[in-house]
A protein has these predicted regions:
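Short, solvent-exposed beta-strand-to-loop segments that form ligand-recognition rims
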Residues: 90, 116-134
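Short beta-strand/loop motifs in extracellular/secreted proteins, especially
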Residues: 42-44, 63, 110-112, 147-149
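Secretory/extracellular carbohydrate-interaction modules
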Residues: 1-73
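Short, aromatic/His-centered strand-loop micro-motif at the edge of beta-sheets
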Residues: 77-100
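Surface-exposed coil/turn segments at beta-strand junctions on protein surfaces, enriched
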Residues: 23-25, 94-96, 128-130, 144
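Short tryptophan-centered beta-strand motifs in secreted/extracellular beta-sheet-rich domains
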Residues: 30-32, 96-107, 112-114
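Ligand-recognition surfaces built from glycine- and aromatic
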Residues: 126-161
Length: 161
C-alpha cells in the first residue's frame, strides 16, 4: 500500500463479506507479516472489524493491532459495541523491518491471545466482539510523504469443533 504524499492520505480496505466471528464452539486465528517504511509517521489498524468506512476514525467492533502517527508502538485492541480494551506498547515497528502480528481467539476460554513475532504479548478477556467481522486494514501517512506498508501475507482461519 503506497499513500499519496499528503498527510492523512491512505486507504481503508476490507475483505468482502463479514465471514469471521467469535463463538464458544469455534476457534479463530488471524495473522499477517508486514513492513512499514516510516513507522512513526504512519497510522495503521490491521485485523478483524465490522464493516466500516473509516476504521481509524473509531470502529464499533473488532480485534486488531493499531499504531498511530507520532509513535512506532503497537497496541493490541479488542472492541465490542464501541467499548474497547487496549494494551499500549505491546511491541514496536522498526522502519523497513518485517514483523509478524497474530492473534488467536480460544472459543472455549473466551479470550484473545495476541502475538508479535511468535511471542505472546497480551491476553484480552473482555470487550470481545460477538458479531461477524471481516479482514480489515486502514493505513495512512502522517506527513506529506508517500509512505508504504508492504504486506507479505495475511491469513485468517476459523475452526469449528
Amino acid at each position: 500500500i503506497t499513500c499519496a504524499a499528503d498527510e492523512n492520505d491512505g486507504g481503508n480496505y476490507q475483505l468482502n463479506g463479514e465471514s469471521f466471528e467469535t463463538t464458544s464452539d469455534q476457534d479463530l486465528y488471524f495473522g499477517t507479516k508486514l513492513a512499514i517504511n516510516d513507522a512513526d509517521q504512519t497510522d495503521i489498524i490491521i485485523g478483524l472489524a465490522v464493516t466500516d468506512t473509516t476504521l481509524l476514525g473509531g470502529l464499533a467492533d473488532g480485534i486488531y493491532f493499531e499504531s498511530v502517527d507520532g509513535a512506532a508502538t503497537i497496541s493490541t485492541v479488542t472492541e465490542a459495541s464501541s467499548s474497547e480494551t487496549q494494551n499500549d506498547s505491546a511491541g514496536t515497528f522498526v522502519d523497513d523491518t518485517e514483523i509478524e502480528l497474530e492473534f488467536y481467539y480460544d472459543g472455549t476460554a473466551g479470550n484473545v491471545e495476541f502475538y508479535i513475532d511468535g511471542s505472546l504479548v497480551n491476553t484480552h478477556t473482555t470487550t470481545i466482539p460477538a458479531t461477524q467481522m471481516r479482514v480489515s486494514i486502514h493505513f495512512l501517512t502522517g506527513e506529506a510523504v508517500a509512505n508504504t506498508c508492504t504486506i507479505d501475507w495475511i491469513r485468517c482461519i476459523q475452526i469449528g469443533r
